[in-house]
A protein has these predicted regions:
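Feature primarily recognizes SF3-like P-loop helicase cores of small DNA viruses
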Residues: 13-18, 45-46, 54-70, 76-89, ...
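P-loop NTPase catalytic core of nucleic-acid-dependent motor ATPases
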Residues: 1-63, 67
Length: 174
């Protein structure tokens, strides 16, 4: 959540260190929980995205949203694609040529990524998986009744507490 707020408020964009992954059986409400994060503005969330970092349209679609849920990550990315995904999600900016533009433009990243998976063994990367922060979900309540605007205000307050920027993992957390 801190990464989401940093993506929204950091003027120079933000390089996120990883993505939160909910792993659990089908039908628990993992995607619905992510949808609740931006329930007050549906245009801020892209749910069930299939992202191809090599495809400009896929990238443009993803980074046009504040929060992107990569649905069913294990079926979207092959083992060879995971390194590209890790590099993409941690990038601070995106270089794109929009339709009808003559030149490429560098856009500061304003997007935070989340993912959901069903199978526990979706990570098969021998080089390490520190970019994927996995939470095993056995039960989740997407209808929790929490005021999401208030929640985001509190997250922002925590992020910029006394002028500090606290969204990066500490050495111990890595």
């Amino acid at each position: 959540l801190l990464s989401c707020v940093a993506a929204a408020f950091e003027v120079d964009g933000v390089s996120l260190e990883g993505l939160l992954v909910f792993q659990g059986k089908q039908g628990l409400g993992k995607t619905l929980w992510f949808k609740r994060l931006a329930e007050f503005n549906k245009g801020w969330l892209l749910e069930g995205a299939t992202l191809d970092p090599k495809d400009k349209d896929s990238v443009k679609k993803a980074v046009s949203h504040w929060i992107v849920e990569l649905g069913e990550l294990e079926s979207t990315f092959k083992k060879a694609d995971i390194n590209q995904l890790k590099a993409f999600i941690t990038s601070k900016s995106d270089e794109m040529r929009l339709p009808y533009d003559r030149t490429f433009t560098n856009y500061q990243r304003r997007t935070a990524f989340f993912a959901s998976v069903n199978e526990p063994e979706f990570l098969m990367d021998g080089s390490g998986n520190r970019r994927f922060w996995c939470l095993k979900v056995t039960d989740i309540n997407p209808h929790h009744g929490i005021d999401m605007q208030q929640m985001w205000a509190e997250v922002k307050s925590t992020l910029y507490k006394q002028g500090e920027k606290n969204w990066y993992l500490t050495k111990e957390e890595r």
